[in-house]
């Protein structure tokens, strides 16, 4: 029905937005499983600060905080040559713990205007805008080409004089930024922060990317349309399980 289609699109928007950022990280052969925790913590801190200042600072603050978290992870991985999976896994646990600590001290509510932004029409417009931007950057620029080339053979890319550390750092910054985008949208949907905000989003995003046909090693298998198709696929599967009477916990 039309209602079901609309519901699927609404649920797909945050997954697809997250995938638009994570695809950069995956294309270079790395991974970022901290985006859900990053989104939740960034939106929570930004909403908390905006409660005592201006509610219109909430969105810019969310994007700044989430990008800084992504930049910090990118710096650790490039500086200390740590494994991206283990680094982002540790940050996932740490960020969730910090968020739970904040929520134990304060009640965090979302600004009212976020209800409008998280609505069907506005959130879909936001997705379309970012799809166009990311398509251009990822598919039509040298930066996107270098990202995919790193996934194929990083040594070769480094040998021709490309700063692979800089590219990796920027990819994690982009992933962090996009985490902030779907973070404030999901916060607006539930009207306030809770310990379950953006729960399992990192897994949904990873599954969306790989279900779409992008290889774990990244490279030139990384295509934007695959991430979008994968995002719809994972949401349709989840809704299908619920429609079949499967409880929420097993379906997740």
Residue ranges and their predicted role:
Residues 1-7, 109, 138-139, 172, ...:
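Inter-helical junctions in multi-pass inner-membrane proteins, predominant
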């Amino acid at each position: 029905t039309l209602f079901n289609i609309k519901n699927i699109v609404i649920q797909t928007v945050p997954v697809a937005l997250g995938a638009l950022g994570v695809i950069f990280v995956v294309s270079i052969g790395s991974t970022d499983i901290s985006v859900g925790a990053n989104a939740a913590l960034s939106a929570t801190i930004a909403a908390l600060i905006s409660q005592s200042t201006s509610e219109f600072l909430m969105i810019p603050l969310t994007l700044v905080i989430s990008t800084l978290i992504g930049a910090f992870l990118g710096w650790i991985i490039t500086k200390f040559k740590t494994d991206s999976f283990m680094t982002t896994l540790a940050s996932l646990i740490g960020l969730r713990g910090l968020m739970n600590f904040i929520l134990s001290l304060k009640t965090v509510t979302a600004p009212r205007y976020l209800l409008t932004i998280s609505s069907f029409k506005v959130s879909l417009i936001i997705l379309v805008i970012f799809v166009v931007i990311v398509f251009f950057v990822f598919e039509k620029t040298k930066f996107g080409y270098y990202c995919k080339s790193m996934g194929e053979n990083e040594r070769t890319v480094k040998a021709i004089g490309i700063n692979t550390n800089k590219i990796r750092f920027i990819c994690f910054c982009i992933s962090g930024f996009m985490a902030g985008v779907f973070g404030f949208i999901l916060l607006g949907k539930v009207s306030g922060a809770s310990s379950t905000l953006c729960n399992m989003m990192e897994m949904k995003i990873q599954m969306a990317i790989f279900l779409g046909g992008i290889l774990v090693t990244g490279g030139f298998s990384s295509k934007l349309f695959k991430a979008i198709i994968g995002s719809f696929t994972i949401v349709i599967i989840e809704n299908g399980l619920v429609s079949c009477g499967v409880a929420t916990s097993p379906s997740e």
